[in-house]
Amino acid sequence: MKEFDYKHSPLREGQFRLLNLHPARGSADLESNLVVRSLGTAVDSTSPILDQPSRALNPEPYRALSYTWGPPCQNDLFIKILADSRAFRIAIRLNLETALRQLRSPDREQFFWIDALCINQKNDDEKSSQIPEMWRIYTQAFSVCIWLGIHEDESATAMEFIKDCLDFEIFEQLVHDTQTSKKWAALAALMRRPWFSRRWIVQEIALAREATLHCGDKQVEWQDFADAISLFHSKQHEIRKLFRESTAFHNHPDYLDDVSELGATRLVEASANIFRKSDDNQIMKHLLSLEALMSMLSTFEASDPHDTVYAIL
């Protein structure tokens, strides 16, 4: 079946697209279809060119994917978009391709909102109209799925260590045992991942009903990660002593840097202070003024100056 580049058609006011990721295992091609949804309803896309809705559907729960785009690929990577017994394709970058393979279910369809696929990246007008709607998209998602990337720099150790940090019966031992210095170093390396420097993430996390953090084949709940980072921050001076006493780090107490300056620490603080939520995690109000939010977000990166404003509206 010959594949053609997919052509998004214009969205109507109040609509956005979702990616229906088809089940498969291992190295099988990434296959999907795009559906159009509005508040409270979703519609099938009967034409890959016109996106004309055919029938209303009960809203399917979806996850919003939060990730870094990464550099352009030297080798062409694509995801298949299936419609009307024809196969189309959209070029994707390596980090997204890796994320989709890791998150894909072997036996059931899953719905995702992914900016690179659900927004026509070749249409500036559509991007301008969809960006202000991101707060609605993230608020409606049943979960935000955070993709940090593949395993490297002992990240698997770090992901497991997060769970250990939340065991209060052994936490003090972790803070004072020199044998744990490598685990603290692995956690610090995880906290330096590029994802934690994106300005958009503050909005994405603050708006999330639930969020999970994924790295390789490991995952933890966002709140567990946030709690572990807060504990790490509160004990950083004691933990730095471990590195002073550890021959594995050449008695180098400054290996960790200042934990409070790491993007992950700033994100945990920022995302907790932007909104007040109800008991069921619904957004109630801003806790900070626009000026205060702008100042708080100044440490996070944005590729376009306008993104700073969009990220907090």
Q: Language-model features: where?
A:
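Metal-dependent phosphate/diphosphate-handling catalytic cores characterized by acidic Asp/Glu clusters
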Residues: 1-113, 119-125, 129, 150-180, ...
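Beta-strand-rich binding-surface signature
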Residues: 59-64, 109-116, 135, 143-145, ...
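Hydrophobic, mid-to-C-terminal alpha-helical segments
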Residues: 126-132, 142, 185-313
